[in-house]
Amino acid sequence: LHINLRRYVGGHPMAGSHQSGPLTAAPELFVDRTWVISARPENPDWAVERTRQLALTCQARIRELDAAEHDRAVAEVSHFPQLVASLTAARLAQVPSEDLRLAGQGVRDVTRIAASDVTMWRQIVSANTAPIREQLVAMRDDLDHLIGALDDPRVVIDLLTRGNEGVRALPGKRGKRPDEVISVVVEIPD
């Protein structure tokens, strides 16, 4: 079979949740979310424009990246965090149930995305192994450093401080700056 892929313009929205399927669809899912477009030189202009129009119709924000930039960026902010959440959650399966009762909301926050569709994530990971591996190796180096210096409060403080900085660097909800979003805390019993 010969398939002409000239018209195929790579791209996808950076939106979704750990849930999948039509029953979890939401009309505002792509509103104000980033939609990556990875056009190739052989793509006709009309095909790239049609892809842009699809993203704009969904009220998404377009970001154009080449394939290598895309793969590196999504490894950093999507694929690697998914695997870290899954590694953390997998360790919980070994924890005695009475100890799991001590878990607070923080553990749920860290592991929420580990409940994502396994088949989808197997495909994503297998399609982007090199950039993901770079992130995992960097984390392994960070873990080795932390393990070796865990008794040094300066190292622990440095890690926690850099963690705070990383959280502050993230954009707020739907791409807005964090100070443009108001937090409202509502207690909902589990």
Regions found by a protein language model. Give the residues of each.
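Short, flexible, solvent-exposed loop/turn segments with mixed acidic/basic and small polar residues
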Residues: L23-L29, Q123, P171-P178
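Short amphipathic alpha-helical segments
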Residues: V31-R33, M120, E180-V184
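Interdomain hinge/lid region at the active-site interface
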Residues: P96-N164, V184
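Short N-terminal or domain-adjacent regulatory/targeting segments
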Residues: V9-A15, G21, V156-P171
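Internal alpha-helical scaffold of NAD(P)-dependent oxidoreductase catalytic cores
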Residues: L29-A115
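Rossmann-fold NAD(P)-binding glycine/threonine-rich loop
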Residues: L1-L29
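A conserved regulatory-domain signal marking ACT and ACT-like small-molecule sensing domains
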Residues: G166-D190
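Alpha-helix N-cap/loop-to-helix initiation residues
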Residues: G16-H18, N43-P44, I132
